[in-house]
């Protein structure tokens, strides 16, 4: 369960442009340690919503993360409830203690997490 919560938090922090800051969570438990949460096999699930909040798609995902020093290779397999299957491979680099950057071949630009 901690891995799933950590993964959700990771994608919220890396995928959304907002005013949230890592310091907003500094006293939260358990502490999010990306190297622990994204190592090995992780199960995830989620929904996509339109601007009015209506759920438009749902998915379950299997992730597998392998660290090599400060670099993570994260393989994702998404199974959408409409039957679509999607795969993605992220290369995530740890920049320093609090900053990460990730790229994937089907994602434009660089994801930044902190």
Predicted regions: what is each one?
Residues 45, 50-114:
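Central antiparallel beta-sheet cores of small beta-barrel/beta-sandwich binding domains
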